[in-house]
């Protein structure tokens, strides 16, 4: 059946009425950037839409290319700088405009810290309706040369019949060939510089998955492989690692294992004369200097006395529990993963720490019903993952702790949990950022709560 043409000039609209047409991907648009979002992108407003522009700073006029548009939100990338902000700097890294590892190198370090502090303050105010009674100065270390672990992407290009080695591009699976990374600690920079050559020299590069680099009490290279490595390739990798004074670890279908069974990875906590052993796959803070400063601040805020019992929730390998045990009468440390509990307990034994007890518990559930939770504590330390500690803090007042330090890698969940703690009678005494990841917008924070 034929349809008559309409002469009204109106286009057909789907059910729901008139809709604003979407901004096409790839379109270039001139924008005036008004402020920075918490993730470091510039924010602009145009035609009723909010634009998020990566690489742009507040006060700049830019030409941006649309990457994605949905509803009233447009994501874009800086294409051309029309008017630069006075604080803009030339990114120190020559790969910065392509690599996805860093996103704030164009912003001076002091301004990065101010952005992170503002992000934390806004989350606390917006979500919890609170501000700390006092702000702590940001905990920060070197802005470059701080990262003690890295994951190197590896992919066999079937068409070109060559191995790609490097870091992922921003929001992409593309691999950027990089032989120098300014945020890595020096020993890993040296390994990274020569790694692509040795990987491409292997007889079966198609067998490679990805490679991880670690630095601590020793350096290590972990090679993940999706098919068995020929003996000659393993020997070549071993020779490379020996020349780099690094351990070689391999991982096929099972757990990572060192080629030398006696090899161990560890990191030192010098102020407490501790050395913690760990394995690839375990959570370890990437920034050694800020990690030490973070522990020192947590202990200063908690101020555990020699006659007090302290609870450490989400204890991991014992990063906080063992230093706490140097000051408190007893530390009870709890972690959700049994393998981590076992390693934390082993770390305590190996460091002659005898006043710390370790337990496994599902910390996504309330604490009620656990024997160790019924014992009572003077102070509590929480260091949860990004999801926060919502279930745990629901009934934390029953522990009768006077002081509580919350270490967070997500200001949004910290603010959510702070609202619960304030509702239970705790006061937010102090808060501040931990600059664990300079040159990125990632915010870590610490907050001190006191009862009554």
Swiss-Prot record:
- Which PROSITE patterns does this entry report, sorted A to Z? SAM_MT_RNA_M5U, TRAM, TRMA_1, TRMA_2
- Reactions performed catalytically: uridine(1939) in 23S rRNA + S-adenosyl-L-methionine = 5-methyluridine(1939) in 23S rRNA + S-adenosyl-L-homocysteine + H(+)
**Annotated Pfam families:** TRAM, tRNA_U5-meth_tr
Tell whether Transferase is among the UniProt keywords.
yes
**Active site, renumbered:** 409 (nucleophile)
Mind telling me which CDD domains this protein's record contains? Answer: AdoMet_MTases (cd02440)
Q: Which domain of life is it from?
A: Bacteria
Region feature (Disordered): 1-25
Q: What does this protein do?
A: Catalyzes the formation of 5-methyl-uridine at position 1939 (m5U1939) in 23S rRNA.
Family to which the UniProt record says this protein belongs: Belongs to the class I-like SAM-binding methyltransferase superfamily. RNA M5U methyltransferase family. RlmD subfamily.
Q: What is this protein called?
A: 23S rRNA (uracil(1939)-C(5))-methyltransferase RlmD
Question: Native species of this protein?
Answer: Pseudomonas putida (strain ATCC 47054 / DSM 6125 / CFBP 8728 / NCIMB 11950 / KT2440)
What is the primary gene name for this protein?
rlmD
């Amino acid at each position: 059946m034929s349809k008559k043409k309409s002469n009204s000039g109106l286009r057909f609209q789907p059910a729901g009425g008139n809709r604003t047409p979407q901004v096409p991907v790839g379109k270039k648009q001139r924008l005036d950037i008004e402020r920075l979002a918490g993730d470091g992108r510039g924010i602009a407003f145009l035609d009723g839409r909010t634009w998020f522009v990566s690489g742009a700073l507040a006060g700049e006029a830019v030409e941006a290319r649309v990457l994605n548009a949905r509803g009233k939100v447009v994501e874009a990338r800086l294409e051309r700088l029309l008017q630069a902000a006075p604080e803009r700097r030339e990114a120190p890294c020559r790969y910065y405009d392509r690599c996805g590892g860093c996103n704030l190198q164009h912003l001076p370090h002091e301004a990065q810290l101010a952005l992170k502090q503002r992000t934390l303050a806004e989350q606390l105010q917006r979500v919890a309706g609170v501000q700390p009674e006092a702000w702590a100065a940001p905990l920060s270390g070197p802005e470059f040369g701080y990262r003690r672990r890295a994951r190197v992407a590896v992919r066999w290009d079937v068409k070109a019949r060559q191995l790609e080695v490097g870091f992922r591009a921003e929001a992409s699976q593309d691999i950027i060939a990089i032989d120098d990374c300014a945020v890595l600690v020096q020993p890993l920079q040296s390994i990274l510089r020569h790694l692509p050559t040795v990987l491409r020299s292997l007889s079966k590069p198609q067998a490679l998955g990805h490679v991880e680099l670690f630095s601590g009490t020793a350096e290590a290279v972990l090679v993940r492989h999706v098919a068995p490595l020929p003996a000659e390739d393993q020997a070549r990798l071993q020779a490379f690692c020996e020349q780099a004074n690094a351990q070689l670890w391999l991982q096929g279908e099972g757990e990572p294992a060192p080629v030398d069974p006696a090899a161990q990875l560890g990191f030192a906590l010098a102020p407490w004369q501790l050395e913690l052993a760990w394995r690839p796959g375990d959570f370890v803070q990437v920034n050694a200097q800020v990690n030490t400063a973070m522990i020192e601040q947590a202990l200063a805020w908690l101020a555990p006395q020699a006659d007090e019992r302290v609870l450490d929730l989400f204890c991991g390998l014992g990063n906080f529990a063992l230093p706490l045990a140097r000051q408190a009468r007893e530390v009870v440390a709890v972690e959700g993963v049994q393998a981590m509990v076992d390693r934390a307990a082993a770390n305590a034994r190996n460091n002659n720490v005898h006043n710390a007890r370790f337990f496994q518990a599902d910390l996504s559930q309330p604490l009620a019903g656990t024997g160790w939770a019924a014992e009572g504590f003077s102070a509590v330390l929480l260091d949860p993952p990004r999801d926060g500690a919502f279930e745990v803090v629901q009934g934390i007042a029953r522990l009768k702790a006077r002081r509580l330090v919350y270490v967070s890698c997500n200001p949004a969940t910290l603010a959510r949990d702070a609202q619960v703690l304030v509702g239970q009678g705790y006061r937010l005494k102090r808060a501040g950022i931990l600059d664990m990841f300079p040159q990125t917008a990632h915010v870590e924070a610490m907050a001190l709560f006191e009862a009554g």
